[in-house]
């Protein structure tokens, strides 16, 4: 998406990737990328991107330091590793940008939360914001600590909605519909509801337009909105559990 949608058509992408399946997937996109199985010695670039598992970063940083890799700016897509820790492991004081995207970047509908360190230059910030803007909607965050909450909301968020769809579809099937019809009812309902939200932008009003006093929807909503066992309590517990885990990951690294 970057290569196809970016104004910077002349950018050179150099990628360290050990997994053959991932390399072949990128090659099928018919874009020019230079691949490496190991970090080259005295590698040079304007921007170095880190998209590795957080627990692997120490090892990667050590290899970069040993190979005297030169870069002007750092962009991290790793959860839980702060800008100060990134600088510490890489033994540098250069600017660091942290980005928390989510799965929907695969269809250019991602939610990208971006934090730039205080020494990031405006031109670079605009360039990175523009680059990630190709993949979806950007939200610039001034407080780095909020990135752990971002991970719990938009980072993990798609999985919550996938689970809801899965459960809703299963219940429809339990009620007697075929799997095909159950899926159609589920996906069609969600798709239509999302379009209505885009038009109205007031979920409480939309809920009121579906429900009526002593009706079927109200009966369901009474269960979903119970104070101590309803959807709000379940979702709050789930999101806070994800945030707690994100916080613990940041302390491990």
Language-model features and meaning:
Residues 20-24, 29-30, 38-114:
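Rossmann-like NAD(P)(H) cofactor-binding subdomain of soluble oxidoreductases
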């Amino acid at each position: 998406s970057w290569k196809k949608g970016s104004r910077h058509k002349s950018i050179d992408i150099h990628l360290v990737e050990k997994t053959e399946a991932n390399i072949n997937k990128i090659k099928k996109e018919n874009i020019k990328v230079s691949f490496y199985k190991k970090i080259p010695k005295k590698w040079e670039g304007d921007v170095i991107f880190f998209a590795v598992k957080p627990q692997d970063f120490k090892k990667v940083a050590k290899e970069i330091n040993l190979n005297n890799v030169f870069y002007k700016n750092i962009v991290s897509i790793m959860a839980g590793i702060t800008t100060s820790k990134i600088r510490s492991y890489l033994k540098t004081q250069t600017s660091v940008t942290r980005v928390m995207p989510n799965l929907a970047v695969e269809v250019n509908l991602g939610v990208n939360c971006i934090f730039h360190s205080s020494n990031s230059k405006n031109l670079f910030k605009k360039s990175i914001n523009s680059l990630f803007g190709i993949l979806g909607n950007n939200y610039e965050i001034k407080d780095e600590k909020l990135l752990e909450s971002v991970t719990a909301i938009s980072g993990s968020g798609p999985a919550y909605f996938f689970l809801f769809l899965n459960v809703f579809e299963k219940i429809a099937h339990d009620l007697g519909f075929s799997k095909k019809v159950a899926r159609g009812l589920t996906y069609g309902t969600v798709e239509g509801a999302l379009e209505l939200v885009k038009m109205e932008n007031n979920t409480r009003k939309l809920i009121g337009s579906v429900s009526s006093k002593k009706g079927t929807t109200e009966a369901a909503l009474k269960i979903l909105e119970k104070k101590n066992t309803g959807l709000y309590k379940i979702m709050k517990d789930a999101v806070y559990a994800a945030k707690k885990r994100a916080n613990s990951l940041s302390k491990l690294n």
